[in-house]
Amino acid sequence: MLPLIANSCRITVLKLRKKEIMTTVSAIEFDAKSGNYFCKVGSKTIKSYSKPYVERRVKAMVGDVEVAMAAAVEKSNRYDINTRFGFVEKLVNMVATGVQPSAVITGEGGLGKTYTVTKTLEANGYKDISDLADFQVGSVINSRRCFTMIKGFSTAKGLYRTLFENNKSIVVFDDCDAVLKDPVALNLLKGALDSYGKRIISWNADMKDDDLPRSFEFTGRVIFISNMDQDRIDQAIRSRSMMIDLSMTLDQKIDRMEFIAKSDEFLPEYDATIKADALALIRKIKSECKEISLRTLIAVSKVRASNKDWKDLATYMLTA
């Protein structure tokens, strides 16, 4: 059990996932005016005329954080990060084959979530129609074997239009976290993500002079790729979707980057030795780096390939 802290301080209990599980414990003080002892634990204040009671409550609350830490550590150790990315492929396969209408994939950006989803869909024979300019005029497109990527999308009405225009297809929402926070958009998604019966999506607001229907049956499928923590996503979405959490520790990020760097598709213009040297430097100074992602590895690999005395420049870029 963590000891009761005699003065105000921050205790970092866990730095395992994207966010830290931490608590701030203040000193126990006495308020002469009210006759109560009080102590702040995080955002909560414990108050009582009995100092031993306050001490017991503080120790219990800090203990709860320790329990959460232990559970998170156990879960993380059970499945390594590359295994979890393999789970993403399996889940996307289920969406592609119509077994599952929706999936939510969460975790920090820049480590291959979008790449894994798109490559898995393409491996299942789906075409990316995100940019219709890539197709010749008059081309026949089988919408049931297509997917479209939506980025930076913000309004509920925009969501309604997107689902209507891409009905029968797979819609991939990439980093559209605003949609997951909008109450109206969430209600629309509930209809789109249900896994039983007809999925009817309705828009009750005035649509005068608009080409959208008031309601329609959605027969497509949805994949969300989000940088949000899984527990911040609305319960209604979580209960209707299958979810994979790709939150990573610093070491897991580098393990994932090492796995990707060994692929022939990653920076094929550079020798494997160059990528290995770049990765070794990142691993050495990982705790000092401002950011660690595939973009980091790409940047350091370029510096390694272009400069004989490359380490100082690369270190400066990563840490300054």
Language model segments and positions:
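Conserved AAA+ ATPase small/helical "lid" subdomain
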Residues: 264-319
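Conserved catalytic/switch belt of AAA+ P-loop NTPases
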Residues: 181-218
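Walker A/P-loop nucleotide-binding motif
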Residues: 98-117
